[in-house]
Amino acid sequence: FHTYFVGECGVLVHNDCKSVEGGVGYDTFDDAKKALGSPGEDKAWHHIVEQNQIKKSGLSSQDIHNTKNLVSIDSGYSGSVHSKISGYYSSKQSFTNGQTVRSWLAGQDFDTQFEFGKKVLEQYGTLTPTKTGWIFNQFV
């Protein structure tokens, strides 16, 4: 998908179009995992926009459990990218007005949460879109 913003001059500006083509959505995370298969050893399927936002933000399960929103990242051990991201989303930051990042995101639209989630992931590695999903390469 493409993202846009309106600048201070009131001009619509194309911001980004780095995305996975098409994407396949599933009703449940289990259905998505069955279709995608194993994320790899010491890895987990990570939702760029968190699963809890189905309830917190009223987002569709087809958008959340979608190949556009899932990426395989290191997980299962202390200090993994997955544990660092989970910790960050549970933390309170200066911009969250006393809320956790997770709560602060609640109610924001999918595209806003998606761009935020990508930026969080990109602190730990590079995200490359393919025709079938994202590839995450962790910084060494």
Indicate where each model-derived feature is located.
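Autoprocessing domains of the Hint superfamily
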Residues: F1-E21
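Catalytic toxin/effector domains delivered as secreted proteins or via bacterial secretion systems
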Residues: C17-V140
